[in-house]
């Protein structure tokens, strides 16, 4: 095992086994409460959604499949008329504020012009239609959310300063926004408007809002908002900051298309990351942070039992959901040794602050820098794991059982995608997930169950 004094990046050519990005529907349809997601694909896409989301059809979830048939692929059917018919049916049954069309691999292959059809159908049915190509051509399944948010970004209203406007113009501009967000959007105190982007549960969003409010920073809005009608206003005077590492496309769209100012901060995962995230936002607004060091120390003290279990243990990230760098940095701060950070895709510009914090954390903890492997080859990873014998492997579901059979403790990386991992108070939930397989093995050892017995053939 080579040890590195600086971060080293490698790139392999491996095929990674991960979910399809259309799985983003699972959490986005719950986050945007007045939305409806229409996935346009084949029966394979439908089977995947039915199995992965685990929602029975009689539950009437706010998503559906538009299954392509031979007539669609051979251009015998009119795509515009078929999609219009489905959207009218959705409008009649659910009447959402927005319909999101999710393109798939098949719509890419047959060159279905969803972007051209959507404006016509939108005009005819009177409901906004957002097109997002969340297909399997992306690197990781979490990038499905990135694609959807980048598409929704174009639908956010334009930010305009209302102070210098005439009365008539002011009323016209204000009417674009919802009653609930109007005052917060236009009357930000002592600092420019701040919009946070990334889909997190409402409780987590409230916690992050509260942490910033302690520093006299008020969040103008979230992308996505809980309701499509409450999207935040965007423009040159608006600052934006991400909460998830896989939203590089959204960040680029916010900067280039909407002219927002991006705050490049580490991500609020773990007490150290949350403190660095808040400090960076404060520094941009010229605000001196108050009580952050004490707040972080208090959280670390509350995590003492978990830290005692993790200290000195080793972990290997195979790469699955683009949360790997942030989680690795947090676990290194907890005293763990990270042998390798496999990651399907690395945007070094968007994650620059996170990579810098990772490097500083390794130096602070006197731990060798982990190697970062982009697009890792799974076969090569297995060979390296056989040599290193880590105490824990954080991996995709496809590799978990084979690794367990070879005596390596595993944790599904997808669990971190759906768990509440952001902010100070949720650090315990992250460590609860990480330590569960280690605690399970400790319990089995006390029972004397140390060997796997092969079944006897009679």
UniProtKB/Swiss-Prot annotation:
[4Fe-4S] cluster binds at residues 20, 45, 105. Signal peptide: none annotated. Keywords: 4Fe-4S, ATP-binding, Chlorophyll biosynthesis, Chloroplast, Iron, Iron-sulfur, Metal-binding, Nucleotide-binding, Oxidoreductase, Photosynthesis, Plastid. Binds 1 [4Fe-4S] cluster per heterodimer. The cluster is bound at the heterodimer interface by residues from both subunits. It is found in: Plastid, Chloroplast. GO terms for biological process: light-independent chlorophyll biosynthetic process; photosynthesis, dark reaction. Its EC number is 1.3.7.7. Component of the dark-operative protochlorophyllide reductase (DPOR) that uses Mg-ATP and reduced ferredoxin to reduce ring D of protochlorophyllide (Pchlide) to form chlorophyllide a (Chlide). This reaction is light-independent. The NB-protein (ChlN-ChlB) is the catalytic component of the complex. This is Light-independent protochlorophyllide reductase subunit N. It comes from Angiopteris evecta (Mule's foot fern).
């Amino acid at each position: 095992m080579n040890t590195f004094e600086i971060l080293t990046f490698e790139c392999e050519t491996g095929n990674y086994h991960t979910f399809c990005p259309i799985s983003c529907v699972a959490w986005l349809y719950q986050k945007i409460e007045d939305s409806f997601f229409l996935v346009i694909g084949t029966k394979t896409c439908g089977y995947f959604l039915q199995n992965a989301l685990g929602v029975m059809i009689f539950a009437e979830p706010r998503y559906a499949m538009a299954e392509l048939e031979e007539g669609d692929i051979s251009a015998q059917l009119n795509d515009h008329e078929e999609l219009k018919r489905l959207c009218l049916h959705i409008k009649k049954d659910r009447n959402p504020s927005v319909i999101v069309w999710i393109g798939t691999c098949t719509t890419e292959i047959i060159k279905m012009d969803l972007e051209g059809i959507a404006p016509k159908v939108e005009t005819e049915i009177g409901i906004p239609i957002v097109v997002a190509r969340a297909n399997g051509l992306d690197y990781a399944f979490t990038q499905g959310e990135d694609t959807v948010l980048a598409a929704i970004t174009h639908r956010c209203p334009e930010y305009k300063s209302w102070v210098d406007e005439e009365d008539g113009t002011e009323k016209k501009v204000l009417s674009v926004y919802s009653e609930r967000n109007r005052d917060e959007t236009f009357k930000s105190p002592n600092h420019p408007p701040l919009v946070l982007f990334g889909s997190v549960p409402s409780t987590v969003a409230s916690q992050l809002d509260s942490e910033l409010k302690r520093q006299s920073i008020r969040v103008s809005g979230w992308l996505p908002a809980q309701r499509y009608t409450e999207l935040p206003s965007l423009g040159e005077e608006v600052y934006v900051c991400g909460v998830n590492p896989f939203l590089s496309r959204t960040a680029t769209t916010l900067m280039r298309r909407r002219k927002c100012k991006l705050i490049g901060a580490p991500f609020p995962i773990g007490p150290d990351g949350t403190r660095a995230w808040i400090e960076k936002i404060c520094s941009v607004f010229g605000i001196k942070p108050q009580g952050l060091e004490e707040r972080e120390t208090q959280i670390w003290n509350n995590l003492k039992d978990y830290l005692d279990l993790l200290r000195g243990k080793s972990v290997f990230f195979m790469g699955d959901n683009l949360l790997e760098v942030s989680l690795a940095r947090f676990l290194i701060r907890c005293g763990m040794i990270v042998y390798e950070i496999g990651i399907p895709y690395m945007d070094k510009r968007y994650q620059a602050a996170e990579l810098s914090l990772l490097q500083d954390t390794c130096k602070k903890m006197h731990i060798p820098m982990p190697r970062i492997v982009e697009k890792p080859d799974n076969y090569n990873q297995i060979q390296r794991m056989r040599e290193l014998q880590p105490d824990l492997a954080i991996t995709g579901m496809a590799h978990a059982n084979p690794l367990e059979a070879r005596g390596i403790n595993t944790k599904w990386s997808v669990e971190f995608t759906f768990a509440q991992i952001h902010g100070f108070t949720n650090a315990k939930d992250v460590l609860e997930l990480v330590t569960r397989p280690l605690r399970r093995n400790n319990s089995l050892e006390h029972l004397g169950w140390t060997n796997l017995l092969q079944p006897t053939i009679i």
